[in-house]
Amino acid sequence: MTEDIAKPAAADEALIIPGPAGRIEAALDCPEGDAPAQPVLAIVCHPLPTEGGSMHNKVVTMTARALRESGVTTLRFNFRGVGQSEGSFDDGTGELDDLRAVAAWAREQHPDMALWLAGFSFGSWVALRAAAELKAKALISIALPVGRSWDFDAIQMPVIPWLVIQGDADEVVDAEAVYAWLDTLPQQPELVRMPDASHFFHRKLMDLRGAVKSGVRGWLPAPPAA
């Protein structure tokens, strides 16, 4: 493994990425802990901007932490109109363009790294819509907002490793609607149902961390024998 893959940037590096609506605020974080660094970069998308969603959301940061502890470099960013990102909320259309721009930057800067996508709530919908187009190698969807105001019918479903995590006690997303929608898909993702977990995983963040780490373990090379 090359030094560039193992250490793509300083930990918690603040970034400004050029986007279609102007500047995009982002943070690139190196793998941490004892897991060997992998040639993988995961972009993690945040929840609904109009309800306070940002790249600093606790579900987003815990997901990114779990990935880094698995040896994966993470890239979080603020959609347009959030934090230092320029522009204004565009109900998913412009936000998809933002993700395209961030992915293009990631591939230009780290061409040897496989691209994964992840998202929470609104961000999971944006990431799902982009996965096939961007040729992501894996996808993590947390609290997919099935049954809310966004269209899931016209999405080109990815044929890649796909982990879906859903709290059974979600008060924002109808968990049963999520499960029913997943049942209609020709390729079933790996589904982790978390009993008693709310939308924001209150008091369940460590369980979420474990679910992410367990879910992606099979996507990564096995560690060398001692």
Ranges and model annotations:
Residues 1-37:
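N-terminal cap/lid segment of alpha/beta-hydrolase-fold proteins
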Residues 33-76:
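Short, surface-exposed "cap/lid" segments of acyl-processing enzymes
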Residues 87, 197-209:
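Catalytic histidine-centered segment of alpha/beta-hydrolase-like enzymes
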Residues 89-110:
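Alpha/beta-hydrolase active-site loop
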Residues 118-127:
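Gly/Ala-rich beta-loop-alpha elbow adjacent to hydrolase catalytic centers
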Residues 158-159, 163-166, 170:
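Short beta-strand/loop motif that positions the catalytic acidic residue
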Residues 168-173, 199-200:
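Acidic catalytic loop of the alpha/beta-hydrolase fold
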Residues 184-200:
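Catalytic histidine neighborhood in serine/cysteine hydrolases
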